[in-house]
Amino acid sequence: MVPAIPETPVRKFNINFGPQHPAAHGVLRLVLELDGEIVERVDPHIGLLHRGTEKLMEARTYLQNIPYFDRLDYVAPMNQEHAFCLAIEKLLGVEVPIRGQIIRVLYSEIGRILNHLLNVTTQAMDVGALTPPLWGFEEREKLMVFYERACGARLHSNYFRPGGVHQDLPPELVEDIDTWAKAFPKICDDIEGLITDNRIFKQRNVDIGVVSKEEAISWGFSGVMVRGSGIAWDLRRSQPYENYNDFEFDIPLGKNGDCYDRYLCRMQEMRESTKIIRQACEMLRKTHGPVLSEDNKVAPPRRAEMKRSMEALIHHFKLYTEGFKTPAGEVYACVEAPKGEFGVFVVSDGTNKPYRCKIRAPGFPHLAAMDWMNRGHQLADVSAILGSLDIVFGEIDR
């Protein structure tokens, strides 16, 4: 008689993905529970880049707080400043001059392209294509130069101000941006030629990480994550801010809500942003005037005026030491950032500093759904799904 082999309990295999994994987008640590090659549970560990931004902001004036927003989603910095400035303008009831609005739109769209170039090409890198990131970074470098020529900094721009933007754009810069925008669709074609119909890229992304319309809404997704599932929700259209109503652009939608559709949406969004950039350059040629509000409560006096008038000098000094006071109240402002709806909820107690500032990072709910999206997928699909979520840790950990 053959002795019965004692049953050994099957132990699930646990594996750490990150924080120093090349596909883990920064400092993400995922604890994966595997059954063979199949993912059963994903446990994201966040907080490794937590800097206490929201708490720090309570001890700074409104103007001193703007640079903190560059450090959230550091791939497209100006889009975050935008939301904070809109919130302050809502509190104060300040109007932005039309030229200032156009410049804001122009640089928000440049930020969108910066973000999508990085995401689309690194998504390809996560599944094994090593050429696209090199091409993407070449274009990002040109856009970084436009950032630098507008405000002097390549990354942490600190360019938007309550009431407009810090300084006007020289005409040569507008021409150079327009020239770049004319040539950019060709670059998009090159990148698409490399990966859109690539057999391996499709096998790794089609029908992976599918999100239905209902699920996207109940998880609190925004941006490409809902548009990839076929929901036409874009704040630039549905709740227009600045002068987006004056621009003609389409909102690309996916059908299947998988990683591949989200990739296609981002590719098409870059083309739409290029259209907006061309229109903005055309508008800037025709529209002249101030780029910062004339309201002296929030905007500093002109440099020439300060050289003549003592009052203007005092005014400037007070504005930059004490800052301006906002009326007490609560306000929420949001923009369509490249990753989704970036919102800022400011509670003001009538002083020169915010009483509380809550930042709604679009990547946070996306990462929260990581566990649900990966269940039943292969281990190799984790990096493909993570790549299509478009996660940057600056804004998730804040």
Swiss-Prot record:
It comes from the Bacteria. NDH-1 shuttles electrons from NADH, via FMN and iron-sulfur (Fe-S) centers, to quinones in the respiratory chain. The immediate electron acceptor for the enzyme in this species is believed to be ubiquinone. Couples the redox reaction to proton translocation (for every two electrons transferred, four hydrogen ions are translocated across the cytoplasmic membrane), and thus conserves the redox energy in a proton gradient. This is NADH-quinone oxidoreductase subunit D. It catalyses: a quinone + NADH + 5 H(+)(in) = a quinol + NAD(+) + 4 H(+)(out). It is a peripheral membrane protein. Belongs to the complex I 49 kDa subunit family. NCBIfam families: NuoD, PRK06075.1. GO terms for molecular function: NAD binding; NADH:ubiquinone reductase (non-electrogenic) activity; quinone binding. It comes from Caulobacter vibrioides (strain ATCC 19089 / CIP 103742 / CB 15). GO terms for cellular component: plasma membrane. Gene3D superfamilies: Cytochrome-c3 Hydrogenase, chain B. NDH-1 is composed of 14 different subunits. Subunits NuoB, C, D, E, F, and G constitute the peripheral sector of the complex. Its EC number is 7.1.1.-. It is found in: Cell inner membrane.
